[in-house]
Amino acid sequence: MKEKYITDDEREKCRKVADAFAELYEIENILVVDAGRYGFFKLQYYRPPQGFEDAITFTDSRSMFENLWEEWLDTQLFLLAKGTPMAGMGYNEIFRCLPKEKQEELMNRKVGFAKTAGIE
């Protein structure tokens, strides 16, 4: 029997996490794929003809969730800052410049993603 790097339980949890962040793949140059016994791969920054510049392997759903959450949040902050004086700021600085309501709205999305993914 070939070695497995991810348990069946974690593989199912990772699949739910990947599905929860489906909207991210539509707006960002990211793809998350199930690599079977190896876990899940986040492929990022596709450049023809070489392919993806960055690949991260996940074998536990919690770290995958946190990584995709940060990616989603950073993308939202980038889009909010684009074309404004905040464009040159770092993500933390952009977040602090947002109205409290917008900050709460963004952070509530994390709760929604966690619920969809079955992460507690």
Describe the residue ranges of each PLM region.
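Short intrinsically disordered terminal tails
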Residues: 1-3, 113-120
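Negatively charged, low-complexity tracts enriched in Asp/Glu with abundant Ser/Thr
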Residues: 1-30
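Weak global preference for isoleucine
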Residues: 6, 27-30, 56, 94, ...
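Acidic, low-complexity, intrinsically disordered interaction modules
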Residues: 35-113
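Intrinsic disorder/low-complexity segments
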Residues: 19, 23, 36, 56, ...
